[in-house]
């Protein structure tokens, strides 16, 4: 009987695609595959609406919303975001990049979102397109076999163990990195060992007029702050610093966060009359990646595959983009098995390209040479427009943008070399440090 049951299970798995996680990556993938007629089960460990950080979106999210049919609903519940403000105490000024100045003029704005609301919109959209959705159930393991379906095990909120079988598994488990951890392919990213702490505030002072919804990136001595205005009147504020900075804090997290805010005059001024809502949250070991994003019967999407840094608000965009590319790959694997290997290679290449395009800037954002370039924008050969296009999420652009980004990189290296040469020739005193790097 057991052998008969196993044969029946292999012939008739519970679903074509099992999606682990119901955040932006998982819900996007599930919606697209269900729309194409696949039997999809999506399981989320929490229950929507639930809190999540990563509230700032990019203009290139807009065509993805259009494709999913959710743009109007997102717009009704969100704060318009027209650009990015960089604030540098080392230069004594602020610089704003408006998305309308990008090479592609079709998407001149984006949104700041409450992730509890936004993620629920995506989750319900997947269900509306035909995916079977389950909440409050944590997936604990996935077993693969060469000649049969994958076997998935989870535990629901009542402690009951549940099992499913599927022809294909999409790991969208976020920072839990279910498959990357299980398969031993998760690696910390040594180039960006950051951590973050953040909270939400009422009555924070915002920018005036149309710029009210812009994200502010504020540098300070130990890293940088984000300042994200939300449509309900609250503002998300977070500090991203080297992990070592948090280890010697010597006090509780809330008091430490207040002291770090006080050390940044720009943020302290904006929060002078503000009131914190809820507790301070910390997230460590920010950057990591999986050495492979796919296998014979699985793919990883979103944070389950990699996470770099939130400085350019790429998290949700990359998650949804991986969802689109991932859904295409999975659809090919299921409908045209002979082309599965090529489809997965294409997915791997697209994932690496999107991550590498953004990461080059992220790895260098704290370097004086990069700060100098961002704080002194010049549109030589339309390079500023190309950088704006990248900041808007245009990571799969053609040669028109890529060629200008290569020129920007060349100028960065020249600027960095000049800065290092200056330091070697004329060492500065500590009291002159701010002047030297400005």
Predicted regions span which residues?
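Glycine-rich FAD pyrophosphate-binding loop
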Residues: 18, 34-53
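C-terminal helical "tail/cap" subdomain of flavin- and related membrane-associated enzymes
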Residues: 331-438
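N-terminal FAD cofactor-binding segment of flavoenzymes
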Residues: 52-91
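FAD/FMN-dependent oxidoreductases across multiple families
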Residues: 77, 245-329, 335, 341-345
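Short beta-strand to alpha-helix junction loop
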Residues: 103-124, 247-252
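N-terminal Rossmann-fold NAD(P) dinucleotide-binding loop
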Residues: 26-27
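Predominantly flavin-linked oxidoreductase catalytic cores and closely associated redox partners
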Residues: 125-268
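Beta1/beta-strand and adjacent pyrophosphate-binding region of the FAD-binding site
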Residues: 9-23
């Amino acid at each position: 009987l057991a052998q008969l049951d196993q044969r029946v299970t292999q012939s008739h798995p519970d679903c074509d695609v099992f999606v682990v996680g119901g955040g932006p990556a998982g819900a996007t993938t599930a919606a697209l595959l269900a729309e194409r007629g696949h039997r999809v089960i999506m399981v989320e460990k929490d229950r929507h609406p639930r809190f999540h950080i990563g509230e700032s979106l990019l203009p290139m999210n807009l065509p993805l919303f259009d494709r999913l049919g959710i743009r109007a609903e997102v717009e009704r519940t969100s704060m318009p975001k027209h650009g990015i403000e960089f604030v540098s105490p080392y230069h004594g000024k602020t610089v704003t990049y408006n998305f309308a100045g990008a090479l592609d003029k079709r998407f001149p704005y984006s949104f700041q979102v409450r992730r509890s609301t936004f993620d629920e919109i995506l989750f319900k959209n997947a269900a509306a397109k035909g995916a079977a959705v389950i909440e409050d159930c944590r997936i604990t393991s996935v077993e693969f076999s060469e000649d049969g379906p994958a076997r998935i095990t989870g535990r629901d909120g009542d402690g009951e163990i549940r099992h499913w079988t599927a022809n294909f598994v999409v790991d969208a488990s976020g920072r839990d990195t279910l498959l990357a951890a299980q398969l031993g392919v998760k690696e910390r990213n040594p180039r960006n060992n950051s951590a973050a702490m953040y909270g939400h505030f009422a009555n924070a002072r915002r920018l005036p007029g149309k710029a009210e919804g812009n994200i502010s990136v504020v540098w300070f001595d130990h890293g940088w702050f984000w300042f994200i205005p939300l449509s309900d009147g609250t503002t998300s504020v977070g500090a991203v610093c080297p992990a070592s900075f948090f280890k010697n804090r010597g006090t509780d997290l809330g008091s430490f966060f207040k002291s770090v805010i006080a050390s940044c005059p720009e943020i302290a001024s904006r929060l002078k009359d503000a009131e914190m809502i809820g507790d301070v949250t910390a997230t460590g070991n920010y950057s990591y990646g999986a050495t492979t994003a796919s296998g014979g019967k699985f793919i990883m999407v979103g944070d389950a595959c990699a996470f770099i840094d939130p400085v350019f608000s790429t998290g949700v965009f990359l998650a949804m983009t991986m969802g689109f590319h991932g859904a295409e790959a999975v659809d090919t694997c299921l409908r045209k098995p002979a082309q599965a290997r090529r489809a997965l290679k294409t997915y791997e290449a697209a994932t690496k390209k999107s991550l590498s395009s953004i990461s080059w800037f992220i790895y260098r954002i704290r370097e004086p040479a990069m700060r100098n370039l961002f704080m002194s924008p010049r549109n030589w050969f339309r390079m500023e427009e190309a950088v704006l296009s990248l900041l808007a999420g245009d990571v799969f652009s053609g040669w028109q943008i890529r060629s200008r980004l290569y020129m920007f990189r060349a100028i960065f290296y020249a600027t960095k070399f000049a800065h290092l040469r200056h330091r070697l020739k004329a060492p500065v005193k500590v009291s002159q440090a701010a002047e030297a790097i400005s």
